[in-house]
């Protein structure tokens, strides 16, 4: 029986077609409209910053990749479908109950929809996915040589960094396209009768056989190409059974030859498949395909497994030594840990020291950091916020400046930003929120090595940071900070941008509108005069931003005039990531005064995920420490095999200008991106001396490097394989922490030069593998003349690590008893600050841990911690007292504290101590009531007891006997209670 004529679809009326077109138009508008608005807004934003070439380059690349990938994949699928249709049999036998006939009729009635729609949908999806790989495309197009060749194939590393990922991407897309073409070709032949399954054997037309066999043959050839590329990817392979990255003995001597054998087998199988075109016999290609699958199991998997178990493992150290050496060399180069960067030096770690030796380490002892930037933010907020809408981040930053005497000091710094979420009541009105409260005001710096006065008890004044302020006030810029600042207004910053509606409307439109500061009698207003901002004076711009932010006030508010501009995307790191989308930014952004301007400094990294023999590292895992976990500031979950701090970026806090500087002049990855986006990165020579003085070694890179140094400091392959000399990053000993101890920025004596000059450095202790004893001390220099140089002090013996030191300090009887008295009855909350490890004297290590106390036991914002004690440990001895000098004297004797920093006077001076005493009074003694009324005998006796206990406490304090001192404080508390209750 012949094929039935196709059933006709009912025609739509004109009105129905119109409604359908309108509905489709609305859907397209809803889907594409927001994206078009976003694209136009980004075009304006990039233009305002001077980086429109970045926007256009990325956009053009994405569009071209989308079109090419979509047309290639869609075209191949369309070809598979079209050829099957055009070569369909003229006559197809059928019967009444043939289910295929119904599908055939349906396909013929919707031929254009199916024939064009399916390939178009597949091509569209392929293009959307492919355009996200624009980075890989640009690296391939502009890639260059590294100047280093891999040890196995002798290819330049640029092949693995820039070419191999592109080849694998193209191969994947072609393979998927051909496979989909095979599937649609097979289905089309089945529907249109080229393949019939009726009867016991079925039937296959000659043209269907030709097409299907050809497509299968092409797939086999593509598999051969994949085997060829697999050989190069072996050099970046990881195995759980080996402690290093890259091709090992089994990979080189079994897997690689197996890949060559599989290539040959794949080519033979492809020939066998193509033979079916002429032989009309499917047994040969079937045998070939089965052979290929069995070979991949036997040759590709079985043989390497045998070699691994019988040859490599029994003699693993000797067999793998050459490849371990390759991995050590490659990993060190990929992560910037080569011999020209890292200097190793033996260090005793527990050498005895006397007071004179400690006193001569003035660069260290005068800069002992007392302020913990993760703890003192509430104090900044309490004393320097001023208004409810100003705010400081929960974690402050560390930078260095010269003090008035020209000494290098580290400072806890912060910009006083506007926090839109802190606005209340009418302040939240749209006009106030976006046109009045637009900016922060001020830069606050506190010397990290000192506090205002001594706080012997949380209820006494003292122990707070000393604030140096740059701020606009009384019509002028008050510049009391460590450097002069001409413009303290902050329009751009991480706090001000941390809101769902991050924009401010500024510009001259009548009277000054923006809140600036207050005097005793008036509120001063201000109008933004910077170059930043996108003009929104035209109705087109107002309409676009009304759609962008879903806010009708852009159209109807009179506060927007012809000179108005909008500031948005105000997060410094996000601005850098936008203009340099090829960078990975550091999680720490910090403010600095550079050339009298307030700027945010951001570190940018170039990374690769493929580098022969280099260990792959997860940035989120490597950079996670107790601080990152506590503040939920984890790095992106990105795996890298190569990283360089290639770019230093600044964002002006006033006008938002973004400037990128080349930091690493030898990074081949950066050179590629400088060719992709010419003119966007300034040469390293453009970094001014003022900016160089505030560049610091980046935290995230340092944390990645210290984790790798834990393994890759080992030179001997045998020792590396046995892991016997590995190190560990210590856990944070603070009982409230739950991750690794963070590295610390400090000013101390120069470890690199091994002299007593002051140096700004990023440091970390390292433990022995699975032990709590110290193995090493790592210091990375941030000084301009030695920037990036890393010094590793290797420590033998059983020197206490951070955990053991913290345990010894916190469990010391004098310390625990004293702090128990201070925190008695949960009246005060005790918090331990950062535990610093400081090399001092000739081969010694000093642990320093500040102690803070605040009223109550909660973490409430109203609880302002202040420094109340300083604890130290040297070897097995504990030093403890209200000041650095007290703790040093307790450890090393008189004279050790001669270089220690003094205490700045408080605004409200506490009662004076007895003459010659360097410690504050123990407590305020109750005085007799005024007037002629005499004390009762019992009350007089209680007062005498108080005075006697105070004398005992002072005597114990002078002697440094903190056990007796703590006992006296407890007796004093009891005596005061007795005095108050006595009639």
Swiss-Prot record:
UniProt keyword Membrane present: yes
Q: Which UniProt keywords apply?
A: Cell membrane, Membrane, Transmembrane, Transmembrane helix
Give any Gene Ontology cellular component.
Answer: extracellular region
Q: Which membrane topology describes this protein?
A: Multi-pass membrane protein
Task: State the superkingdom.
Answer: Bacteria
**Keyword Transit peptide assigned:** no
Protein location: Cell membrane
Spell out where the chain crosses the membrane: 20-37, 63-85, 113-135, 169-191, 212-229, 260-277, 284-306
- Which family does the UniProt entry place this protein in? Belongs to the UPF0182 family.
NCBIfam families according to UniProt: PRK00068.1, PRK12438.1
Check the record and name the PANTHER family matching this protein.
Answer: UPF0182 PROTEIN SLL1060
What is this protein's record name?
UPF0182 protein ML0644
């Amino acid at each position: 029986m012949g094929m039935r004529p196709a059933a006709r679809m009912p025609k739509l009326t004109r009105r129905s077609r119109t409604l359908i077109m309108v509905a489709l138009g609305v859907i397209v508008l809803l889907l594409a409209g927001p994206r078009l608005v976003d694209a136009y807004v980004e075009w304006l934003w990039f233009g305002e910053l001077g980086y429109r070439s970045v926007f256009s380059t990325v956009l053009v690349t994405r569009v071209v990749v989308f079109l090419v990938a979509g047309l290639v994949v869609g075209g191949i699928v369309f070809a598979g479908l079209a050829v099957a249709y055009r070569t369909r049999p003229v006559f197809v036998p059928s019967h009444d109950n043939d289910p295929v006939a119904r599908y055939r009729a349906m396909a013929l009635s919707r031929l254009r929809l199916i024939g064009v729609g399916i390939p178009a949908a597949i091509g569209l999806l392929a293009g959307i996915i492919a355009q996200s790989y624009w980075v890989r495309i640009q690296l391939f197009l502009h890639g260059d040589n590294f100047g280093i060749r891999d040890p196995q194939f002798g290819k330049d590393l640029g092949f693995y960094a820039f070419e191999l990922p592109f080849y694998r991407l193209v191969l994947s897309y072609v393979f998927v396209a051909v496979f989909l073409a095979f599937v649609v070709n097979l289905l089309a032949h089945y529907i249109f009768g080229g393949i019939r399954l009726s009867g016991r054997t079925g039937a296959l037309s000659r043209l269907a056989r030709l097409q299907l066999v050809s497509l299968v043959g092409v797939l086999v050839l593509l598999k051969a190409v994949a085997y060829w590329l697999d050989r190069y990817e072996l050099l970046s392979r990881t195995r759980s059974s080996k402690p290093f990255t890259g091709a090992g003995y089994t990979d080189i001597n079994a897997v690689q030859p197996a890949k060559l054998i599989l290539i040959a087998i794949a080519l033979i199988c492809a020939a066998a498949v193509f033979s079916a075109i002429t032989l009309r016999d499917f047994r040969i290609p079937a045998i070939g395909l089965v052979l290929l699958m069995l070979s991949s199991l036997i040759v590709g998997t079985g043989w390497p497994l045998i070699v691994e178990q019988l040859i490599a493992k029994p003699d693993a150290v000797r067999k793998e030594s050459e490849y371990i050496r390759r991995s050590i060399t490659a990993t060190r180069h990929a992560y910037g840990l080569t011999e020209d960067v890292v200097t190793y030096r033996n260090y005793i770690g527990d050498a005895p020291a006397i007071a004179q030796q400690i006193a001569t380490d003035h660069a260290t002892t005068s800069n002992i950091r007392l302020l913990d930037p993760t703890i003192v933010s509430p104090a900044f907020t309490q004393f320097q916020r001023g208004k409810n809408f100003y705010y400081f981040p929960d974690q402050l930053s560390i930078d260095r400046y010269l003090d008035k005497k020209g000494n290098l000091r580290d400072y806890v710094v912060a910009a006083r930003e506007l926090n839109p979420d802190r606005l209340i009541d009418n302040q939240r009105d749209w006009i106030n929120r976006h046109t009045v409260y637009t900016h922060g005001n001020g830069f606050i710096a506190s010397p990290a090595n000192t506090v205002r006065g001594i706080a012997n008890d949380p209820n006494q004044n003292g122990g707070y940071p000393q604030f140096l302020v740059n701020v606009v006030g009384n019509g002028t810029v008050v510049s009391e900070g460590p450097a002069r600042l001409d413009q303290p207004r902050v329009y751009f910053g991480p706090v001000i941008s941390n809101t769902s509606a991050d924009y401010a409307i500024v510009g001259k439109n009548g009277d000054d509108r923006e809140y600036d500061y207050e005097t005793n009698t008036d509120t001063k207003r201000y109008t933004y005069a910077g170059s930043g901002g996108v003009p929104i004076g035209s109705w087109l711009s107002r309409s676009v931003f009304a759609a962008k932010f879903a806010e009708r006030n852009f159209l109807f508010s009179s506060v927007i005039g012809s000179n108005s501009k909008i500031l948005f995307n105000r997060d410094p790191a996000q601005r850098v990531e936008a203009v340099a989308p090829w960078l990975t930014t550091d999680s720490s952004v910090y403010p600095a005064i550079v050339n009298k301007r307030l700027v945010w400094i951001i570190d940018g990294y170039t990374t690769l995920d493929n580098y022969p023999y280099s260990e792959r590292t997860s940035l989120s895992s490597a950079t996670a420490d107790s601080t990152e976990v506590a503040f939920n500031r984890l790095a992106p979950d990105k795996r890298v095999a190569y990283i360089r701090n290639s770019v230093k970026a600044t964002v002006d806090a006033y006008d938002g200008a973004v400037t990128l500087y080349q930091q690493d002049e030898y990074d081949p990855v950066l050179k590629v991106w400088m060719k992709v986006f010419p003119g966007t990165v300034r040469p390293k020579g453009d970094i001014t001396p003022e900016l160089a003085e505030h560049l610091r070694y980046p935290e995230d890179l340092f944390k990645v490097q210290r984790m790798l140094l834990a393994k890759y400091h080992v030179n001997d392959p045998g020792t590396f394989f046995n892991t016997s000399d590995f190190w560990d990053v210590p856990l944070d000993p603070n009982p409230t922490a739950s991750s690794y101890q963070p590295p610390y920025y400090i000013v101390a004596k120069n470890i690199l030069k091994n002299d007593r000059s002051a140096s700004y450095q990023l440091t970390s202790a390292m433990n022995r593998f699975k032990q709590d004893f110290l193995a090493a001390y790592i210091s990375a220099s941030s000084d301009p003349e030695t920037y990036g140089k890393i010094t590793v002090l290797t420590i033998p013996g059983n020197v206490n690590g951070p955990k053991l030191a913290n345990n010894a300090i916190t469990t010391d009887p004098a310390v625990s008893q004293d702090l128990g008295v201070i925190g008695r009855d949960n009246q005060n909350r005790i918090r331990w600050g950062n535990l610093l490890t400081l090399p001092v004297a000739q081969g010694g290590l000093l642990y320093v841990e500040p102690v803070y106390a605040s009223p109550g036991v909660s973490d409430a914002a109203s609880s302002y911690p202040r420094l109340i004690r300083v604890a130290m440990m040297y070897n097995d001895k504990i030093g403890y007292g209200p000041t650095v000098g007290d703790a040093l004297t307790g450890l090393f004797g008189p004279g050790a504290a001669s270089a220690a920093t003094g205490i700045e006077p408080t605004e409200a001076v506490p009662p004076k101590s007895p003459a010659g005493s360097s410690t504050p009074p123990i407590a305020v003694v109750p005085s007799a009531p005024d007037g002629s009324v005499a004390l009762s005998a019992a009350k007089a006796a209680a007062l005498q007891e108080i005075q006697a206990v105070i004398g005992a406490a002072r005597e114990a304090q002078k002697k440094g006997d903190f056990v007796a001192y703590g006992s006296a404080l407890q007796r004093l508390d009891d005596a005061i209670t007795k005095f108050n209750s006595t009639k």
